[in-house]
Amino acid sequence: MHGAPKYPAGFTHFNYADPNAPKGGRVVLGQTGSFDTLNPLIIRGEPVAGIREWVYETLMARGFDEPFTMYGLVAKSVEMPPDRSSVTFHIDPAARFSDGKPITADDVIFSMETLRERGRPNHRNSYKKVVRTDRVSDLAVRFVFDASGDREMPLIMASMPVLPKHLLTPETFERTTLAPIVGSGPYTIAAIDAGRSITYKRNPDYWGRDLPVNRGRYNFDEIRYEYFRDMSVQFEAFKSGVLDVRTEDDPKLWASGYDIPARRDGRVLTREIETGLPAGMSALAFNTRRPVFQDPRVRRGLLLLFNFEWVNKTLYHGLYKRTESFFERSYLSSAGRPADARERELLAPFPDAVLPEVMEGRYRMPVSDGTGHNRENAREAFRLFSEAGYVIDGGRLVHKDTREPLGFEILAGSSVQQRLIASYVSDLAKLGIAARLRVVDSSQYQSRLKDYDYDMIQTAWPSSLSPGNEQVFRWDSRNADVPGSFNFVGVKNPAVDAMINRLLEAEGDEDFTSAVRALDRVLLSGHYVIPLFHASRQWVANWKQVQGPKTFSLWGYNLDTWWIDGQK
């Protein structure tokens, strides 16, 4: 999309994959919660882990060591005019579903039309920009795009999963199902224990095993996901050897939980993996659809009352860094950078959308002295609450006109979130704010998330160096009231919409970077979330028979490039 591909025509394999990696063995991974469907492409149900990665294939494969390039997979070649107004995919004649049926243009067209009409909101939003579909031949399809100028659309279509038309109808597609799904990917479904586990088996007849994008990947004969009721039980399963690999996101466990005999004698390995990706945004997210959070002064005040320095020291062994941007840890971040001329031009039609300190690069998350008091930030927070109409009455913060207390519920879907949220709730209670924590099971949490039935949640929006149409799904006004979107906050901001459009229209690296930074500034100025923290590296633990490559991609840990060492 921007720049030149990293790999030339005729390349043999991705640099982060070892073409000599041995095949064989089984790897077992852990998941928390449960599942009730094998279909991850619809909004209904709680999908099982792994279908998208192991069973379905997309038209083209992403290169994980560059942000804007995809290479041939189901589509052997692609044609595109300079203005990116259309894209033509030429299907590899060898491409097959796991039942042996060839993949044809009819499967590709069926996939697009079905996902556009009945898929998840992100598919519906993106594929509706296809205004015409041409069946060029049995093995070629052309998609023609609308006049919106979205230059990412060829990559969006290249990322589309290909569904078997001979096994599905639009009606059967949108049902939740536990019947094994047929795809064209490297694995098939070998066993299902509803809600408890799923096992994938490497397909010995996989049509694409020798493609350059696949060499050195998909090395395990079996991949099994075991489900556990909570993270603590899952961690015990790893320590006892039931699970083979674990990605850790709990600093307390990383700091001390892996001091076990198996690690001390070398049977368990821990590693910290560098990643070239932005850290993304992990945050406490306000549901601005709720009246209590519609005043940005209230949101800013609550942000000021989050005592990161104390939380990091007390709960997380000081292992986290504060997140200052939606594109933290990358050149796309606006933090500490004054807006350039391009950004100012983009933002000029929205003079009130960005705070002066954000525009000038002076904005920072509030800092405390690391004690449990946070007095200076509390004084500024109460000034903002007062401006918003709140007063102290009998030790409670209430609105001076309605007498409604400043109070809300923070919804959590796992016990892991309880420590942080309970700490924040306790701090707010000392200041007369009636926050409360509610923990529900995974199924109920996902259901309430889809319907925006919460006041506040702890959530995360991952990021990459190629932000695009996923930003529409997260922040655009059109998705604020669409069930199942990732616009958890309910953002309805014309400046946000405009900046997303500009990043999608950008033709060069500089224009793209300026548009992303401008979007970052508008989101930060809106105080839609309380930014939390991030680790500087990925934390991965594994039993030593599971081995990984010496070179990692920008994305860091990718299980599909690991293997079993039979000697260990």
Indicate residue ranges for each PLM-predicted region:
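Aromatic- and charge-enriched surface segment that lines or borders ligand/interaction sites
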Residues: A17-P22, I42-G50, S77-P121, V136, ...
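Ligand-site clamp/hinge motif
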Residues: D92, G208-Y258, R300, V416, ...
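Extracellular/periplasmic solute-recognition and catalytic clefts
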Residues: R132-R135, A190-K201, E226-R290, R297-G301, ...
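Gly/Pro-rich hinge or "lid" segments in bacterial periplasmic/extracellular proteins
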Residues: Y56-E66, E113, M157-R217, D221-R224, ...
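A structural "hinge/loop" feature
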Residues: H13-F14, G33-G50, V74, K101, ...
